């Protein structure tokens, strides 16, 4: 099993051979490698693929002090998480450790939600990004549209007595349209199982969420000179689609693909359209 190491924390990644420049897939808060299965299948063979588990997710180490997960939530602070490597800068440094371990020079970097934030930070701090694909994400900062209050309330208003699967299903609802979940009950059940197998521990998920809250590259990305594809669902109830337009206005060389009526998990809900846009963009810059 390939692993990289940074500051004593082991970062797991998968590496599939291909003919062209590696495509690197970076996940959102708490999500495991499963979330990119549709896109990985679409580029497999033509492109080399690298898929790391973010710190605290899947087979990667959490790197959290042993006592921290046992502390009452109100005593856990963003500073504690940051010292344990949970800032967007720290997660981008983990990604650099992976790419250094693989030994690649240039990559097509694809990130969704928090993964899109890591991708932006990586492109600013390091020099391997040949292109960026930013899905359902934001540049952060005071101008970015935050998670809607209605979504926040839903995520934290978990029904009493719900078991682990029921809690996960409840919290996941805002990430999909009701139309999609009603039409795909078996897939939603499978996603729950994938999440139980690969997702972050509760403490690591909290640490990743704290990293997102501290993210702001709204000024730095103005000087970014990397071809960028921006994909966003117009009905995203987690990171509103206005953030895609802000990114397109701020990054110099961009292509904006708004997918009408799609959700935060647009890469699942409208995988074919995302794959078509991604494949065309990668081929253009290969």
Regions found by a protein language model. Give the residues of each.
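Conserved HGGG/HGGXW glycine-rich cap/lid loop of the alpha/beta-hydrolase fold
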Residues: 5-76
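Active-site loop/oxyanion-hole signature of alpha/beta-hydrolase fold enzymes
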Residues: 51, 55-110
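Gly/Ala-rich beta-loop-alpha elbow adjacent to hydrolase catalytic centers
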Residues: 111, 115, 119
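Conserved alpha/beta-hydrolase catalytic His-Asp/Glu region
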Residues: 143-144, 165-213, 220
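Short beta-strand/loop motif that positions the catalytic acidic residue
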Residues: 224, 230-232, 236
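Conserved alpha/beta-hydrolase "acid-adjacent" motif
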Residues: 237-243
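Catalytic active-site module of serine/aspartate enzymes centered on a nucleophile-bearing elbow/loop
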Residues: 254-286
């Amino acid at each position: 099993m390939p692993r990289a190491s940074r500051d004593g924390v082991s970062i797991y990644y998968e590496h599939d051979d291909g003919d062209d420049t590696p495509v690197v897939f970076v996940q959102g808060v708490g999500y495991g490698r499963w979330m990119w299965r549709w896109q990985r299948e679409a580029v497999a063979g033509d492109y080399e693929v690298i898929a790391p588990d973010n710190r605290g997710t899947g087979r990667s180490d959490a790197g959290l002090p042993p006592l921290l997960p046992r502390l009452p939530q109100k005593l856990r602070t963003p500073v504690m998480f940051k010292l344990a490597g949970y800032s967007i800068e720290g997660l981008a440094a983990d990604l650099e450790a992976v790419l250094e371990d693989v030994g690649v020079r240039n990559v097509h970097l694809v990130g969704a939600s928090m993964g899109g934030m890591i991708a932006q930070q990586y492109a600013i701090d390091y020099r391997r990004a040949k292109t960026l694909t930013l899905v359902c994400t934001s540049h952060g900062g005071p101008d970015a549209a935050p998670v809607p209050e209605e979504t926040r309330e839903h995520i934290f208003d978990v029904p009493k007595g719900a078991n682990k699967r029921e809690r996960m299903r409840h919290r996941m609802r805002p990430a999909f349209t009701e139309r999609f979940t009603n039409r795909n009950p078996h897939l939603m059940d499978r996603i729950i199982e994938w999440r139980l197998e690969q997702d972050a521990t509760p403490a690591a998920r909290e640490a990743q969420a704290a990293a997102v809250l501290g993210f702001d590259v709204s000024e730095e990305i103005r000087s970014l000179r990397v071809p960028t594809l921006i994909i966003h669902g117009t009905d995203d109830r987690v990171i509103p689609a206005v953030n895609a337009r802000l990114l397109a206005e701020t990054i110099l060389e961009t292509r904006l693909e708004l997918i009408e009526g799609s959700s935060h998990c647009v890469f699942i809900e409208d995988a074919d359209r995302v794959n078509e846009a991604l494949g065309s963009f990668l081929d253009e810059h290969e």
